[in-house]
Amino acid sequence: MSDLAQGFHQAQQDVHSLAERPDNHTLLRLYALYKQGCEGDVSGPKPGFFDFIGTAKHEAWGKLAGRTQDEAQQQYVDLVAKLRG
């Protein structure tokens, strides 16, 4: 396992033990970076109009289209480290 993969895995664990819950904007950013880092560009249909949370997640992930999985993983690691202080 590469250093980046190990760091990404550790950040996934660390995010669950943050001292404070991040704001919704940061949570969406974490979600989008995680999905981009694991799966690449957004796929599948956009959630229905009344699925506000699903739509917000889909749009946040879609904004990262074209970013490599390695870039997204590194940004996820960096964001979690920043949140941990």
What feature does the model see in each segment?
Residues 1-85:
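A charge-rich, low-complexity, intrinsically flexible signal that marks solvent-exposed coils, linkers
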